[in-house]
């Protein structure tokens, strides 16, 4: 798990740096490129969950990690031959996005198969480990301007290969449930959707996570690279600094939850953290120095740590064993499926009104979603038990 997120951390910096700084693409095309990384989730995340519910997740993760070494190596060859173009990055984004959509459900299902007690704490510890690994990748990618993209892409591939080696040392983790004979993967996907839609505990969490994808993730992956480039004249180092502050806040929040244990009012914690994130977004619309942006990103990251940990805990505890991988895939699909929509919209919105004014719109939209959840769902009263 750590290897995948270390690789992801490198990609978080390298990909937008190549699009926005190296190729100097306008905000709309930055948004479209970021969309290519997330769009496969819409089509494949639930399929990945259906596959993981029926298979040995250890074997799946080994295969996915090895396949994921190919796109960064191919991109390194293209850059080394001075053939980098916008279309190449779109193809890379689609390839890595496809593999991410398959890896995440298998990873989450594997956790529930190896942890028998204390799942809430295990989720927090796992999340913290992932975020620390991602932070290391972000720090390493901050040197892209100095050491070059080729070296970092090779390092990304090596990290993924080491992950496959680590997974190979785990015990087999076959499916623990019996599925209906003759049930196709499409039937399994539909069954997972019905299960989530019919659950009063799971449904509002997935709605909230979809809003996170559209209004928070989409804004984060498009507005920040454009702001760093246009407002501060920054490159990979400044983009890495901003991301480090965000993910640093997420790590602090997650480690605090590990220390404190399970939150009693998990749904309430989620909603308050999302409201705080909307306030941070609105504040980003105001001009200020780079250190001000980094502080805002740290605060935003603290809220993200609460939302990710408590949301995943609610879903993992509420989902039945027979449907858990598919339900967790829907949880991930919520924000990863919403992100391409948000990235595309925010890219063109930033091109129309500018990156700072554009930050106000998703903040206001998130407040409207929270009001809907407050009055039309039980999320505010929901407990992680």
Which residues fall in each region the model found?
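Helix-loop junctions on the cytosolic side of multi-pass membrane transporters
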Residues: 109, 113-114, 153, 159-183, ...
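C-terminal transmembrane bundle of multi-pass solute transporters/carriers
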Residues: 42-47, 54, 58-60, 64, ...
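Helix-breaking motifs and short loop linkers at transmembrane-helix boundaries and internal kinks
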Residues: 24, 56, 78-83, 286-288
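Helix-loop boundary and gating motifs at the non-cytosolic
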Residues: 1-39, 198-246
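Substrate-agnostic recognition of the 12-TM MFS/MFS-like secondary transporter fold
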Residues: 1-12, 37-50, 56-71, 88-145, ...
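Transmembrane alpha-helix termini and helix-breaking/packing motifs in multi-pass membrane transporters
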Residues: 14-22, 75-81, 136-156, 230-231, ...
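Juxtamembrane intracellular "pre-TM" segments in multi-pass secondary transporters
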Residues: 173-207
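The feature captures the transmembrane alpha-helix scaffold of multi-pass secondary transporters
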Residues: 31, 86-94, 206-207, 290-298
């Amino acid at each position: 798990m750590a290897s995948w997120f270390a690789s992801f951390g490198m990609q978080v910096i390298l990909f937008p740096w190549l699009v926005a700084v190296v190729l100097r693409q306008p905000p709309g095309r930055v948004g479209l490129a970021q969309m290519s990384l997330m769009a496969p989730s819409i089509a494949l995340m639930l399929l990945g969950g259906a596959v993981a519910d029926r298979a040995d997740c250890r074997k799946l993760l080994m295969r996915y990690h090895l396949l994921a070494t190919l796109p960064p190596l191919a991109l390194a060859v293209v850059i080394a031959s001075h053939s980098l173009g916008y279309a190449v990055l779109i193809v890379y984004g689609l390839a890595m996005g496809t593999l991410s959509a398959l890896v995440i459900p298998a990873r989450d299902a594997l956790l529930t198969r190896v942890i028998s007690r204390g799942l809430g704490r295990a989720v927090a510890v796992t999340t913290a480990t992932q975020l620390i690994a991602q932070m290391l990748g972000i720090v390493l990618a901050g040197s892209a301007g100095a050491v070059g993209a080729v070296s970092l892409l090779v390092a990304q591939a090596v990290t993924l290969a080491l992950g496959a080696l680590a997974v190979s040392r785990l015990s087999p983790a076959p499916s623990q449930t019996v599925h209906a004979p003759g049930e196709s993967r499409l039937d399994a996907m539909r069954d997972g959707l019905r299960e989530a839609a019919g659950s009063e505990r799971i449904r509002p969490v997935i709605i909230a996570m979809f809003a996170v994808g559209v209004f928070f993730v989409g804004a984060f992956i498009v507005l920040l690279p454009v702001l760093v480039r246009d407002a501060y004249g920054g490159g990979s180092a400044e983009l890495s600094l901003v991301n480090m502050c965000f993910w640093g806040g997420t790590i602090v929040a997650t480690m605090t939850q590990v220390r404190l244990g399970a939150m009693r009012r998990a749904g309430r914690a989620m909603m308050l953290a999302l409201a705080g994130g909307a306030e941070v977004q609105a504040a980003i619309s105001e001009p200020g120095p780079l250190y001000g942006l980094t502080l805002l990103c740290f605060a935003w990251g603290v809220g993200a740590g609460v939302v990710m940990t408590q949301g995943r805990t609610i879903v993992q505890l509420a989902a039945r064993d027979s449907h858990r991988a598919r339900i967790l895939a829907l949880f991930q699909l919520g924000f990863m499926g919403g992100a391409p929509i948000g990235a595309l919209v925010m890219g063109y919105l930033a091109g129309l009104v500018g990156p700072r004014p554009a930050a106000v719109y998703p903040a206001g939209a998130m407040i409207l979603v929270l009001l809907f959840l407050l009055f039309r769902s039980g999320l505010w009263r929901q407990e992680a038990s």
